[in-house]
């Protein structure tokens, strides 16, 4: 069947099925705690599916959407508690490898907290709630819980994509160098990227835009990691548990200087790919052919 005439049943089932496959692929090794990358990929799938379901919400049964999204938020939180410390420790180790004067007690603290997170992941992935979520997602690939299974989705998806572009333009126009602003921009970029990937069957020009948005997301993610690391370092050296014999102010300042030095090298690397993506999006928007209606299409 032509992509133009694909129904909600076919389209939504395929979207959910792709992420359900990722869940199954990485579940076993993530549960055993032997592969940090599996935890990362499982968390990515969780976040991706939540964003995809938000994008497709108008097509989905409302109670199913609400329940599944709640379960995804729950398991995503458990996975995040582990993955955030994997990233934090890798970053701290990278900095410490280039400066032996940096106090390592903060790394030991992060490793202790990561181990606690590992136990939480193993318990969560063994719970009935998670197993039921897997079954629900697998069922949804075959029988998507839709308001109208036979509706033609092309126009609906492209309308939603246009809305995501509007939000991206606004976020780009109003962003400042404040960390909170950059984090919000990253979320908008991520949602726009995923929307582009969902809409790709209807849009030949999606790939170069997706590639540039992925670069923006990665660069902004690095900057956010810097902020999280700074917060962790400051909290540790302000605590009574910080290493004895180490001046907490000197140790904290040394780490913060190292983090800021690396951050300055990357601070503006997201700007060029975002500008390129917006130019490409504007080019597509001016091409009215992708917005033309086909017989049988409607909006929701």
Please tell me what each predicted stretch does.
Residues 1-300:
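Function-determining surface determinants
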